[in-house]
Amino acid sequence: MLIDFHTHLDFYKEEELFPQLEKFSGIIVAASVDENSYLTNCRISDHIQKTNKLCQIIPTFGIHPNQADQNAPLLDDPTTTARFIKYLDQSPLIGEIGMDFCWSKSSPQNQEKVFRWFLDYCNKTKKACVIHTKDAEEKICNILTDYPHARPVIHWYDGPEKIYREFIRRGYPQTFGVETIRSKHLQNLLKSTPLNLLLAETDNPESEPWLGGSRNDIFLIERVYSELSEILNIPRTNLEQILEENFHCIL
């Protein structure tokens, strides 16, 4: 079974997305970046449930660090937080959340406020959460010690090896995707990752074109599986079984 653990289905044009989903067999975790993103992913999931029983879409609610400035003030409004908590209760896991000191224009203070708000929920409910760490790896590593019952999944880590080793020591699962085949650093991290902490992703539809590739279709996850299999020198069928087992350990 193919499992794409991190995508942004709401970024696609629906007239391009739906024909692909109707042919896909597997599981797609549809990460959200804010409220509207989550509601769009839920609508996509509802549509595909009626047209392709072999394609399971899992919408997850989160607020990306890029959206922190707009959303941090909303967390002081009880009506809004009640609505957000309803979305969180509906989500089998939480994401995309985190901090970004490289590309995000949101203030570090607002990023941390939003991140901690979600971590507090995950800590209370023991739900898994998918975390964006770009250039904020050390800060996030320290913050996570305040939430021992949250269950982080680290998305597309490409930071310092020292912090990666600490994340592995804590047992945080790691996603690897389309950049892995292009990066010796990521390949070294992949090879040092216990197989029971490994997940695959595409971060579709923007990541592959951002890296200079031409594809952004949902079947790109097949190529990611093949590339990870090659790098790890593991038969593709064995890797599929490992990733499926890891997925079910998280959800």
What are these regions (language model features)?
Residues 1-251:
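Mid-domain alpha/beta scaffold segments of enzyme catalytic cores
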